[in-house]
Amino acid sequence: MSRLETFYDVMRRQGITRRSFLKYCSLTAAALGLGPAFAPRIAHAMETKPRTPVLWLHGLECTCCSESFIRSAHPLVKDVVLSMISLDYDDTLMAAAGHQAEAALEETMRKYKGEYILAVEGNPPLNEDGMFCIVGGKPFIEQLRHVAKDAKAVIAWGSCASWGCVQAARPNPTQAVPIHKVITDKPIVKVPGCPPIAEVMTGVITYMLTFGKLPELDRQGRPKMFYGQRIHDKCYRRPHFDAGQFVEHWDDEGARKGYCLYKVGCKGPTSYNACSTVRWNEGTSFPIQAGHGCIGCSEDGFWDKGSFYERLTTIPQFGIEKNADEIGAAVAGGVGAAIAAHAAVTAIKRLQNKGDRP
């Protein structure tokens, strides 16, 4: 197996000082939600561990995961792609095309057998022997199985690879399936979202490269560090929910005052993601902050769960302190009555309080 440069080797070759390198390690620790004590461990890993070869495949998808990934700010995607990893194949970002690109894929698989990470964006269709998605003249499902067999680990980018997403929505004429239905003998890290948050994507890669292991996963295979809590739990509109202050109609007084969007379809109470903490566009905002309810794009089968603007009505009661593992997949899948009751009771109390005022 050929030797790869370490991340620190690459940074020194680029003229980056030791001080800047240590500063980068501190910022990386902060971006991962780790304390300052982890900065030396990250620095040691960057100095001693070789850059990991990554092969990035594309199946049925819209490329929104790649679009999100290249906009990462912490760390910058240029540092990830050019220094931290060795992105040896990605037909969307690489300069080579056609036979040259496929030759690069085969060469990396041969040189780094059992050492490379497979990243998958999109999913494979099974109908008509996979002919609904062709890459390099062959069905994508063949390429996926071929590259996965010698991978050290697999990352499923986005809801397409993790759950199936819109391609697998009813009636699913191509029989698109998530990649875990095809790859059954490799560890898979699911990073759902349509698309996932940029810093979540780079954070997962950084963790794997730094600590040499998969991040802690929940029962559905998602990193707990980013998918351990509901968006509802950390939402800045949560106090309005508890106070029974809701947007009833778009552009009503409640909407203008920034009240809770639960009654106009927000799926935050049943969606596990880091949107309300990490946010989007370098931490600028997220859909709820922009005035639109969460559509639950990181959850399994969200396209087939009714209108984006339909109020949830079957959510079982569970507290803010609960996480995905404690609640379990069954509860997270069956969604609404207690929250609906809570909303009704708090609204009635508000009306009563108004009536008591002189």
From Swiss-Prot:
Species for this entry: Azotobacter vinelandii
Annotated positions binding [3Fe-4S] cluster: C275, C294, C297
Enzyme Commission no: 1.12.99.6
Cell location: Cell membrane
Domain of life according to the entry: Bacteria
Stored NCBIfam families: hydA, TAT_signal_seq
Gene3D superfamilies the UniProt entry points to: Cytochrome-c3 hydrogenase, C-terminal domain, NADH:ubiquinone oxidoreductase-like, 20kDa subunit
Location (main, coarse): membrane
Binding residues annotated for [4Fe-4S] cluster 1, in chain numbering: C62, C65, C160, C194
Short name of any one Pfam family annotated for the protein: NiFe_hyd_SSU_C
Function summary: This enzyme recycles the H(2) produced by nitrogenase to increase the production of ATP and to protect nitrogenase against inhibition or damage by O(2) under carbon- or phosphate-limited conditions.
A single BP term in Gene Ontology: anaerobic respiration
PROSITE patterns: TAT
Protein family membership: Belongs to the [NiFe]/[NiFeSe] hydrogenase small subunit family.
Membrane topology (UniProt): Peripheral membrane protein
PTM field: Predicted to be exported by the Tat system. The position of the signal peptide cleavage has been experimentally proven.
Keyword annotations of the record: 3Fe-4S, 4Fe-4S, Cell membrane, Iron, Iron-sulfur, Membrane, Metal-binding, Oxidoreductase, Signal
Residues in the signal sequence: 1-45
Name of the protein: Uptake hydrogenase small subunit
Record-level Gene Ontology MF annotations: 3 iron, 4 sulfur cluster binding; 4 iron, 4 sulfur cluster binding; electron transfer activity; ferredoxin hydrogenase activity; hydrogenase (acceptor) activity; metal ion binding
Classification via InterPro entries: Cytochrome-c3_hydrogenase_C, NADH_UbQ_OxRdtase-like_20kDa, NiFe-Hase_small_C_sf, NiFe_Hase_small_N_sf, NiFe_hydrogenase_ssu, TAT_signal, TAT_signal_bac_arc
Gene: hoxK
